């Protein structure tokens, strides 16, 4: 499989997990397994992954009422990965780089 990471999952709950426990949440491909996810995070962000937990999320069922009857459908199933890093490491979602506990210098002048 190429790259199982699709996007970071940024919600209020996932941001709290990042701040409190150092866990990061990503939306990943449904066919991805834990070892593929771990390798992709380590390669993309250059960090050491301590553990990976995954959750399969079922897509919502949708119904549309028309004159001819009811049209039923379903959104796609997807998977979330909870990634815990080793102590002192962090991921910066927005730049794609890592922060190894060093403070960034500001260039205000």
UniProtKB/Swiss-Prot annotation:
HAMAP family in the cross-refs: Ribosomal_uL23_B
Disulfide pairs here are none
One Gene Ontology biological process: translation
One matching Pfam family: Ribosomal_L23
- Signal peptide (from-to): none
What protein is this chain from?
Large ribosomal subunit protein uL23
| Assembly and oligomerization | Part of the 50S ribosomal subunit. Contacts protein L29, and trigger factor when it is bound to the ribosome.
Organism ancestry: Bacteria, Pseudomonadati, Chlorobiota, Chlorobiia, Chlorobiales
Originating organism: Prosthecochloris aestuarii (strain DSM 271 / SK 413)
Q: Which GO terms describe its molecular function?
A: rRNA binding; structural constituent of ribosome
- Tell me the function of this protein: One of the early assembly proteins it binds 23S rRNA. One of the proteins that surrounds the polypeptide exit tunnel on the outside of the ribosome. Forms the main docking site for trigger factor binding to the ribosome.
Superkingdom of the organism of origin: Bacteria
InterPro entries linked: Nucleotide-bd_a/b_plait_sf (IPR012677), Ribosomal_uL23-like (IPR013025), Ribosomal_uL23/eL15/eS24_sf (IPR012678)
Q: Which UniProt keywords apply?
A: Ribonucleoprotein, Ribosomal protein, RNA-binding, rRNA-binding
Q: Name one GO cellular component term.
A: ribosome
